[in-house]
Amino acid sequence: MSYRELVVELAREHAEALSDALLDLGALSVSVEDADADTPDEQPLFGEPGLVPDRTAWQHSRVVALLSADHEPAVLLAAAANEIGLAETPKFVVREVEEQDWVRLTQSQFEPIPIGERIWVVPSWHDAPDPDALVLELDPGLAFGTGSHPTTRLCMEWLEQSVKPGQSVLDYGCGSGILAILAKKCGANPVIGIDIDPQAVESARQNSERNRAEVTYGLPDACPDGEFDIVVANILSNPLKLMASMLASKVKPGGRIALSGVLARQADEVAAVYARYVDISVWREHEGWVCLAGTRRESH
């Protein structure tokens, strides 16, 4: 059986309503994406620490609906547009989607990933290429972080070089838990992972259990008081700037901090905010992204 994708670009205020209408009218699934993704106009959605995002779509949104072959896309879209009160039916594109073995296709797209000197990120359906390496078993899922993105890779390379056995580590914005798990496998103790998304926290817990890595996870209000030898945050530049004072305060005097999720063109601006608290600079750049790393100044 073949399927079709109906792709519509429209303003944020109509995206959620159109999505609901398409589902009501028989769409098999609907997703909302940033129509400006991977461009300078990309708009990440995020909440303040401890809060969920207050927006569910982007200013310039792309609605993608999966339809069975017996649905006529133009008719369905016209009905959905009428249902939500749009004066005109939005422009759209239709893409053919052939029936496939989706599990096998998904698995074929995720091969073991070598990172740094001795790290392998390995999906559960693969054997580790080097059993003696530092192996993290991680499947792609709902939470961000499989090692394939440059920012995750940069943070992992930094942790591999920086963590010493017995050091305490805070992973703020832990996503899948990949950085916290790596820190634990490098000998860190204790390791804490914090995320604003309860689904990410649960995913991280499951990944830690699979990797036999003892990490404590929680939402921001569960973040323990006190300071850590190492703080790592792979988020995005805007929330990193907003949380600079809080994140810096979690680093012990003389301790280290690593920040990623920062484009190379944003590095100076982020570094300037953190320079009030830590001596910080670009540690490494990869594919247009950077990892900033620094040391908290000793108290006098």
From Swiss-Prot:
This protein's name: Ribosomal protein L11 methyltransferase
SUPFAM superfamilies according to UniProt: S-adenosyl-L-methionine-dependent methyltransferases (SSF53335)
Cellular component, GO annotation: cytosol
The protein's role, per its UniProt record: Methylates ribosomal protein L11.
Organism: Burkholderia cenocepacia (strain HI2424)
Catalytic reaction(s) noted: L-lysyl-[protein] + 3 S-adenosyl-L-methionine = N(6),N(6),N(6)-trimethyl-L-lysyl-[protein] + 3 S-adenosyl-L-homocysteine + 3 H(+)
Similarity annotation: Belongs to the methyltransferase superfamily. PrmA family.
Top-level EC class: transferase
GO biological process, one term: methylation
Residue sites binding S-adenosyl-L-methionine per the record: 152, 173, 195, 234
Alphabetical list of InterPro entries matching this protein: Ribosomal_L11_MeTrfase_PrmA (IPR050078), Ribosomal_PrmA_MeTrfase (IPR004498), SAM-dependent_MTases_sf (IPR029063)
